[in-house]
Amino acid sequence: MTHLQAGLSPETLEKARLELNENPDTLHQDIQEVRDMVITRPDIGFLRTDDAFILRFLRARKFHHFEAFRLLAQYFEYRQQNLDMFKSFKATDPGIKQALKDGFPGGLANLDHYGRKILVLFAANWDQSRYTLVDILRAILLSLEAMIEDPELQVNGFVLIIDWSNFTFKQASKLTPNMLRLAIEGLQDSFPARFGGIHFVNQPWYIHALYTVIRPFLKEKTRKRIFLHGNNLNSLHQLIHPEILPSEFGGMLPPYDMGTWARTLLDHEYDDDSEYNVDSYNMPVKDVDKELSPKSMKRSQSVVDPTALKRMDKSEEENMQPLLALD
């Protein structure tokens, strides 16, 4: 075992070996193989390439060197293309702070039987008058940044439960294609986390319809790990034991305290702001809240490519419309 594996239990070390192809004898060589690929993408500002950081991406891609590098590149490219999201990227930012306090996201105290961290979202808690959907996404990404520092979670991963109870049609109408694409690319394509399951509970018909629309844009692996339980909490309990769930999910624990995870981040004053800023990338900043621009989010193109700054055509303008139109 190398110092890079020091935070892992014997059980997790064995899991990393069997499931992720992690080999302590070649660990430094594996990391260097990924680091050597950085020069192939001069259009991206790789702000971190230290051993511990690259190891997260290797674990997320089961030590396939090229796939790990591609994820590393997409991680920084996403931040480079959406710089405004990562300005004031800290728990004390007003929008992030309020989203955290409303439970975006929450984190249960107990791990599941696979050692995974259970994240929870209560969708109806979103107060549109105080913070935006982008703030919610920023709060989730900041939380994941803090959690992924735990090497146990790098190996074991996460599960997510979203409770859609009382989430209104009006709230759902704010979920535009570009907002959803921003979330999908930020979480599915650009972050070194292993998601073992995403569970929808109490979802109304319009959320089911929304999922049908975005499903083709999800990776096959992601689609297989999304479970639509509706009001059937028994099917949820077959996958996540009720002994570790709060009462909102039919569990045996008291109701979830929405501010638990927010207090954790705020008490530690978690701040990732210094990593991703305008000066580091030295590139134009885009106002994500203002435009959620359809000319962004094209993973294969560099933000410094002037051809990206083109006029929207009609099809792109249509993409700015809500998926669920209000009468």
From Swiss-Prot:
Q: Which PROSITE patterns does the record associate with it?
A: CRAL_TRIO
Q: Which GO terms describe its cellular component?
A: clathrin-coated vesicle; early endosome membrane; endosome; trans-Golgi network
What's said on domains?
The CRAL-TRIO domain is required for targeting to the membrane and for binding PtdIns(3,5)P2.
Q: Where in the cell is it found?
A: Golgi apparatus, trans-Golgi network membrane; Early endosome membrane; Cytoplasmic vesicle, Clathrin-coated vesicle
Protein name as annotated:
Clavesin-2
State the organism of origin.
Mus musculus
Quaternary structure annotation from Swiss-Prot or TrEMBL: Forms a complex with clathrin heavy chain and gamma-adaptin.
Record-linked SUPFAM superfamilies:
CRAL/TRIO domain (SSF52087), CRAL/TRIO N-terminal domain (SSF46938)
Chain residue ranges for the region called Disordered: 289-327
